[in-house]
Amino acid sequence: MSYNSSNSGSGRYDDNRSGNSSYSSTSRGGSSYGNRSGSDRDYNRDGGSYNRDSSRDYNSSSGSGSGNGSSSYNKYPSSSSSSSSSSSTSSYGPSKGKDFQDSWGSSSTGTTNGYNGSSNGYNSSSNGYNSSNSSSSYGASNNGYNNSSGSSSSGSSGSSNGGSYNNSGSSNSNGYSKPTSNYSYSNGYTGPTTNYSSYSNGYSTPPTSTSTSSSSTTTTTTTTPSTSYNGGSTSYGYSTSGSSNGYGGYSQPPIPSYDPSSVSSYGAVTPASSSYNASVPGSSYGNSTYRSSGYGNQSYATTNSYGSSSYGSSGFYGNAKANTGSFGSALSPISWDLSKLPRFEKNFYLEHPDVSKFTQEEIEKFRASFQMTVKGREVPPPIMQFTQAPFPGYLMKEIIGAGFPNPTPIQSQAWPIALKGRDIIGLAKTGSGKTLAFLLPSIVHINAQPVLREDDGPIVLVLAPTRELALQIQEETNKFGGTSQISNTCVYGGASKHTQVAALKKGVEIVIATPGRLIDILESGKTNLRRVTYLVLDEADRMLDMGFEPQIRKIISQIRPDRQTLMFSATWPKEVQALAHDFLTDHIQVHIGSTEITANHNVRQIVEVCQDFEKKERMLSFLGSVGRDEKVIVFAETRKGVDDLQRVLQFSGFKSIGIHGNKSQPERDFVLSQFKNGMVPIMIATDVASRGLDIKDIKYVVNYDFPNTIEVYIHRIGRTARAGASGVSYSLLTTDNARLANELIKVLTEAKQKIPIELSNLSVTPSTSSNTKKFSPYPTYSKRY
């Protein structure tokens, strides 16, 4: 039975495949989007791809296999014998693939106990593929090594799943003979440049009693193992049969997404006990050359050391442990000793002479004009013009080139606070310029810190609730941080973790991350947050709404407590207040707009009350009244609702596209690209797109399904009328939304919007008496319902 995959199609999403029960599939896609049959969309995800370019994913280094990326799949291998061609070439995993670069082991001519390359493949796991001829590959899995869902190895007694080969009788107690030349890895699993041992794929064989018959071309060995290859272990990398420090050296379950660098084992880049920057022991990090000679050609922190005496002295490096508990439980809070931490500079503010001349009356008048309120001690005056901002010349050039007339209200007050090194809480509506409010001061902060070394963590960490918002922040970072040669990376779920980890390993000054993926990487020990001195929590209220509070607290426990922290939020609920109380020090609060929940006054709000079955007709009627090229976001409550509405709109002649959490990251990127570029004017979305999408020319927002809270309603309609533009929101309410009617009326009243009589009727609280008929806002048509 062969596993063959070919792809002769082209186009961005060539997923026209058939079948999912066979091990053979063919893609002949054109440029159609998302047309699939079967369930093989799940076979084409990050890591362990089943159905990518098979010429590189499977057996691309095969010797005498069927070629062109095909190899046979031996489901029922012999448990007692194996044969190997004298010219066999076996590879462990793909030679080239999305997450793999090198073959695991080199071939060995004439060997007798080859793990792969035998006539009877060893493994029958769902992700393992072995050739019945001399060319074979052990296969890839989602974790970059043998998935432990298959059957046990050939010749093993009592082994379970996976592919770790350790035994008490091998030449090396680690279960693997030490490589004779450099060991390199990618995603933890690419291998030595020469064999690990004398065996065909570098594996020490278990003790055997052997009878051998040879010919000029083959050697057949009958093996009776005295111990099992796996020794009963159930996951890759375990050593339970006499090995004290096997490949991974685990005496406890390893971290999922196994990587040797996360523990003290062969091939580890930095053992868990190594000190921070131990590659240059005792070196004075404080005397390093600062980028651009620091801020204003000054130097800072010329004392203390980042070498062996400071960071790392507690023995932690990323605090990676076995993931034996709930998500994030492997991260232990660090007990920080501030007296041993190297100093860092965070006050760079040089007040412009024009700002110094402002009278208190002028300052109060400026703040009042934007409904700005500030709380805290020693609040610096706002910056009213870009020329008054104390940014370096290269940043000013970028700002002027962007064509901004003046700072937004939040920027005018946040910049001097942030540049003074103070903690800040910024409360402002969406589309108010919060990203640049924290980004530009962060660039100044970075340029005054010691330069990064390899394997250092970031200096600036920005946490965002969604990958869309994280990517938008990265886009702004690339625009304004490029001239200063500041590097950044974006860490979020749904994309290749290997690529993200590789960027972190090189060293980046700014990391923009969603909490879940960052926790995952921290637990695996691939990076650390010991260099972070500038922390940003963007859309903090949204992160708490999404349940990220435990992850946020875990992440902050890994950051030195004397950092500078900036928190931005559109609302100020008690949960956000509690978070600010716990993690901000001597902060200044800046609130733009009313302290009540209010909507953008530039949005014309249209509200209609109807029955549920009327909603589609009313939506289509409204969309028919707007220009065909105008950008519209339609919000639905569920993923199924998004897909259903897309079909309805397409059938009705409206060009539309949908986005929700079930779509892969490439699909979501494609949808956003089509919508941003105007190729598709209507985007249907769940609330995954209701926050952080910075698309400035959205004219209309349609609430097909009214949200569960007024806060979400305000965030949704905030997608339009950004950066001073005007927009329109159109919302459909049913009797199911009656509990929100009073709050909605308050929002409409504050924004001086028209209140329909049906909404007023809906806001009347019906009697709870059992004799009271069901309330309806439609007295004229009540008999019809």
Curated annotation (Swiss-Prot):
Major enzyme class: hydrolase
Reactions performed catalytically: ATP + H2O = ADP + phosphate + H(+)
Predominant location: cytoplasm
Pfam families per record: DEAD, Helicase_C
Stretches with biased composition (Polar residues): 178-191, 764-774
Motif interval(s): Q motif: 384-412
UniProt-listed GO biological process terms: alternative mRNA splicing, via spliceosome; nuclear-transcribed mRNA catabolic process, nonsense-mediated decay; rRNA processing
Domain Helicase ATP-binding: 415-590
Record: residues binding ATP: A428, K429, T430, G431, S432, G433, K434, T435
Region: Disordered, residue numbers: 1-233, 764-785
Gene Ontology molecular-function annotations: ATP binding; ATP hydrolysis activity; mRNA binding; RNA binding; RNA helicase activity
Motif (DEAD box): 538-541
Subcellular location: Cytoplasm; Nucleus
Domain Helicase C-terminal: 602-763
PROSITE patterns associated with the record: DEAD_ATP_HELICASE, HELICASE_ATP_BIND_1, HELICASE_CTER, Q_MOTIF
Domain of life: Eukaryota
EC number(s) on file: 3.6.4.13
Residue ranges with Low complexity bias: 1-11, 18-37, 49-95, 105-177, 192-233
GO cellular component, one term: ribonucleoprotein complex
The entry's keywords: ATP-binding, Cytoplasm, Helicase, Hydrolase, Nonsense-mediated mRNA decay, Nucleotide-binding, Nucleus, Ribosome biogenesis, RNA-binding, rRNA processing
Described function: Probable ATP-dependent RNA helicase which may be involved nonsense-mediated mRNA decay and ribosome biogenesis through rRNA processing.
Classification via PANTHER family: ATP-DEPENDENT RNA HELICASE DBP3
Domain notes: The Q motif is unique to and characteristic of the DEAD box family of RNA helicases and controls ATP binding and hydrolysis.
Family as reported in the entry's similarity comment: Belongs to the DEAD box helicase family. DDX5/DBP2 subfamily.
Protein name stated in the entry: Probable ATP-dependent RNA helicase ddx17
Source species: Dictyostelium discoideum
